[in-house]
UniProtKB/Swiss-Prot annotation:
InterPro entries: PCRF, Pep_chain_release_fac_I, Pep_chain_release_fac_I_sf, Prokaryotic/Mito_RF, RF-1. It is found in: Cytoplasm. It comes from Clostridium botulinum (strain Hall / ATCC 3502 / NCTC 13319 / Type A). The keyword Protein biosynthesis applies. The keyword Protein biosynthesis applies. It holds the Pfam family PCRF. One of its GO terms (molecular function) is translation release factor activity, codon specific. Gene3D superfamilies: 3.30.160.20, 3.30.70.1660, 6.10.140.1950. Peptide chain release factor 1 directs the termination of translation in response to the peptide chain termination codons UAG and UAA. This is Peptide chain release factor 1. GO terms for cellular component: cytoplasm. Signal peptide: none annotated.
Length: 358
């Protein structure tokens, strides 16, 4: 590990020199790329330097203990040695996590697709609850949310809805939300007070660059139609809504949020690319998952990941056995406690993988 950290520190110094070189700054595209690489290494280098400083201080205190005869100074040195030993253990753990393989999609913006599952109108209302939860979470993170498409019901639910979430680290946090979400509650329409179970499916897709995936124009069928709002009423007098069908896979994407047909087409193409990219990534991850049966989650949208129990005010994440009794605030976007636990578990699994490789 130390050899790798020394290499990273040297690379960081090299990048520091490059990004301050006027000749490199003249090429803005290259300069921005180097600045990002420099920023990505900064936390590792700073932590490593703190680790080296603690090591030096520890050796200094040990030397003092050998040479010093004053009782008070020896006690001070012994106390410092204890503190520095614990600090070095913490920093070593932190460095191990920082050196874990990074998900190349973590810095990307995302599309969140929410679809009502089993449960009819109640499932559609739950899909609406989930959309609000992610919207409120995005607000807490100062991320931007844009509606791409929606299929609303007459009483405020959604059969399906797609939104774009743009902001730093959006995918790194939201990627753990893919899967089947289950709700247990008494519907407003239930006169007998019986608890119903309904589901909604969430898919979180990283927005991909043109270089990540190529689409042949001949593989697309593009239809235009008039946009509709809640309950199906027409909200536009021109054919601005766009439906794109990817013929080889049968994937269909719609977008009706913008008044401009061109903008709707651009947004729909971004979603289509994200879906095709996800399909390719899922195929690749399937073989890896065979060796990681206990992993936090495959991101498979058929995997039941969480239950929201209204009578008990309880949320249970089935992947890690986490139970929280804060349903109201959770649905208001306070979901970081669950996400942090999932991140920690994911890191532990990656560390196990590294151990198997080594």
């Amino acid at each position: 590990m130390l050899e790798r950290l020394n290499f990273i520190e040297n690379k960081y110094e090299e990048l520091s020199n490059k990004i301050s070189d006027p000749s490199v700054m003249a090429n803005q595209k290259e300069w921005q790329k180097l600045c990002k690489e420099h920023a990505d290494l900064e936390i590792i280098v700073n932590t490593y330097r703190e680790y080296k400083k603690a090591q030096e201080d520890l050796e200094s205190d040990k030397e003092m203990l050998k040479e010093e005869s004053d009782k008070e100074l020896r006690e001070m040195a012994q106390e410092e040695i204890k503190e520095l030993t614990l600090k070095l253990e913490d920093l070593e753990r932190e460095l191990t996590i920082l050196l874990l393989p990074k998900d190349p999609n973590d810095d990307k913006d995302v599309f969140i697709e929410i679809r009502a599952g089993a449960g009819g109108e109640e499932a559609a209302l739950f899909a609406s609850n989930l959309l609000r939860m992610y919207t409120r979470y995005a607000e807490r993170k100062n991320w931007k949310v844009e509606t791409i498409s929606l299929n609303a019901t007459d009483i405020g639910g959604f059969k399906e809805v797609t939104v774009a979430v743009k902001g730093k680290g959006a995918y790194s946090r939201l990627k753990y939300e893919s899967g089947v979400h289950r709700v247990q509650r008494v519907p407003d329409t239930e006169s007998s007070g019986r608890i119903h179970t309904s589901t909604a499916t969430v898919a979180v897709l990283p927005e991909v660059d043109d270089v990540d995936i190529n689409i042949n124009a001949n593989d697309l069928r593009i239809d235009v139609y008039r946009a509709s709002g809640h309950g199906g009423q027409c909200v536009n007098t021109t054919d601005s809504a766009v439906r794109i069908t990817h013929l080889p896979t049968g994937l269909v994407v719609t977008c009706q949020d913008e008044k401009s047909q061109l903008k709707n087409k651009e947004k729909a193409m971004k979603v289509l690319k994200a879906r095709l990219f996800e399909a390719a990534e899922a195929e690749r991850a399937a073989s890896i998952a065979e060796d990681r049966k206990s992993q936090v989650g495959t991101g498979d949208r058929s995997e039941r990941i969480r239950t929201y129990n209204y009578p008990q005010g309880r949320i249970t994440d089935h992947r890690i056995g986490l139970t929280l009794y804060k349903l109201e605030t959770f649905l208001d976007g306070d979901i970081d406690e669950a996400i942090e636990a999932l991140v920690t578990e994911d890191q532990a699994e990656k560390m196990k993988d590294l151990g198997r490789v080594n």
